[in-house]
């Protein structure tokens, strides 16, 4: 499965860079992962691969459990995605435009908390890792 985490902005904080690097390494056995950094949302949209299945992290989105993220989203894409790249979009400090919200197959939220967009990209990678482990029945997730 090809997964792209597409983000507005660069990651500069060394502790977040280290966390991202760790999860990218952990995800290697589960998917082909790319992280795309765009200067702005126009760049994010322009870089979407043809035929990509877009999921956007947005404060207006649905809060999913890790099980639902794994089975309903990752599992569904593995079985029915037809090999299309799966893109998880993270907006900048102001979130996503209506264009991205309309284009997305689903809006996903980490709840009603305000979370720095730089940290969200690490959280997305962690949930991808957890989701793939859940799908394979590997230990690590606790309900």
Where in the sequence are the language-model features?
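S-adenosyl-L-methionine/SAH cofactor-binding core of RNA-modifying enzymes
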Residues: 28-87
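Structured adenosyl-cofactor binding patch, chiefly the S-adenosyl-L-methionine
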Residues: 99-142
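Conserved strand-to-helix beginnings and helix N-cap segments that scaffold or border functional pockets
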Residues: 16-20, 66-67, 101, 121
